[in-house]
UniProtKB/Swiss-Prot annotation:
Domain Ricin B-type lectin span(s) in chain numbering: 532-652
Protein name: N-acetylgalactosaminyltransferase 7
Domains as described in the record: There are two conserved domains in the glycosyltransferase region: the N-terminal domain (domain A, also called GT1 motif), which is probably involved in manganese coordination and substrate binding and the C-terminal domain (domain B, also called Gal/GalNAc-T motif), which is probably involved in catalytic reaction and UDP-Gal binding. The ricin B-type lectin domain binds to GalNAc and contributes to the glycopeptide specificity.
Region (Disordered): 31-65
One of the GO biological process terms: carbohydrate metabolic process
Organism: Homo sapiens
Highest taxon of source: Eukaryota
Disulfide bridge positions per record: C197-C435, C426-C507, C545-C562, C585-C600, C625-C640
Gene transcribed to yield this protein: GALNT7
Amino acid sequence: MRLKIGFILRSLLVVGSFLGLVVLWSSLTPRPDDPSPLSRMREDRDVNDPMPNRGGNGLAPGEDRFKPVVPWPHVEGVEVDLESIRRINKAKNEQEHHAGGDSQKDIMQRQYLTFKPQTFTYHDPVLRPGILGNFEPKEPEPPGVVGGPGEKAKPLVLGPEFKQAIQASIKEFGFNMVASDMISLDRSVNDLRQEECKYWHYDENLLTSSVVIVFHNEGWSTLMRTVHSVIKRTPRKYLAEIVLIDDFSNKEHLKEKLDEYIKLWNGLVKVFRNERREGLIQARSIGAQKAKLGQVLIYLDAHCEVAVNWYAPLVAPISKDRTICTVPLIDVINGNTYEIIPQGGGDEDGYARGAWDWSMLWKRVPLTPQEKRLRKTKTEPYRSPAMAGGLFAIEREFFFELGLYDPGLQIWGGENFEISYKIWQCGGKLLFVPCSRVGHIYRLEGWQGNPPPIYVGSSPTLKNYVRVVEVWWDEYKDYFYASRPESQALPYGDISELKKFREDHNCKSFKWFMEEIAYDITSHYPLPPKNVDWGEIRGFETAYCIDSMGKTNGGFVELGPCHRMGGNQLFRINEANQLMQYDQCLTKGADGSKVMITHCNLNEFKEWQYFKNLHRFTHIPSGKCLDRSEVLHQVFISNCDSSKTTQKWEMNNIHSV
């Protein structure tokens, strides 16, 4: 009986355990109408979600996770998505709040979708008068050669026995390479900074930099002196690399000799060679792709010398705010003697802002009182509407977020304006830095130049200008076409990607830019009136045209064979009765007869009237007519005589191609 009872109890225990397991399994099995554990987790989280109408990934329904809205080509391992520029800015589709305005969260969302946020911590520089700055050299800079030529940037003047060799070097390279080759590559330079610059103290947590130098058939000593000066005057901990981009040079000294020479620096200096001539603009974009070690890209022309303590003032603003682009004050290295002097113009301190006229020629205008009021000291960085383009510093990733240079810009010209407008209108800042000085050699007259490759075609610079104004100037582009009417029918390629970039990045209008940043441009270069007519001024039924011969500011115009290429033979007459070429006007000379060309503003030299049907230009103040001597090739005014064929002219439109 005991056996039977024990057996029964054990059987009941087994059955009960089995039934318990069945019940437990049943409770754990999901039913079709049961919410999943993950959905319950989302519900619990959404209770505290400040944006409850957003999806489970924290973004609005249908919104992808953040990806940089930047055109980065995939080159040498640099990850960039060209299609991302087409991505619609999702912030625009956010629900409007009942208050009617954007919340701070919406604003932050838009900014984040446009550019990456600042993550680097950097403290503002501190001015301590009388206490030498922490980046200032404690001892005077040693010379390259004691007592050597050109030390301290003193002029080196060679005798007449070198004249022929100097002229040949200027023709080939644009500089007096005879003198340059006599000067040490490590020469000492003069200090042109304001005294106050010596007492700035900078946070040592500066970003590192890659210095990018593009060259094409550059002279040896001017190129290498650029490199030497950077290495000599840049703290080594911040100099990640120097990247040389050889834009298809064919000079022997820029091949194996260069490769061997840079081995002196054990990999600090690198050279990359383009397989075809790309031009300065696109070669700089290539340089950005090749330079991978530095956090900041510093661009220098291939004939520069950086000055004492140039680095910290230039990079400090970028270390504080990654959307700031900085430009050093550019001094002039004389291409004959290699003396370094401050650039002319500007205000009483030599400070100028970058500007342009409506023909898109580069200009410098004095620093305005408004900009001076924004600074506590005269050596702080100040805002500039534009840069000259050859020398500047920009955070590497920010430059890629901006899309580098417009890939449709060719060789040289206009890229300085394009990057300046893009920075300002899309949320960045462009600052000139008084305490960072860099000397630059300007090409001398007599240089044969570097003609663009055949594949580029004609008028690359003018095409560049047209692309820039079509993308960035909005309604202001009409003023460019008034100044450069020959460009109205010029094909400039596809700019849809660039327009989309503006839209996706919420870039501001050019009107905003002109009113808030470039507010002083029109006071120096007023908006031009509409044209009455434009083109070559040809002697009626002749092959001779009025030609400025490249003269400006008081030179006399002449007659020359018509070439239908515009340039020095392209004029326009506007509704203000000015007969102009670029920013120059025609007027009578001091002798009261010969016609000269000189700089003018809108209130000057309103002297001409063109009677198209009569083929006549009348000089309004004198009542005389425009005349010519086809023997002496002179242009002058004389008493009007309808029977004189030399007073008959025709103005024929010229279109650039």
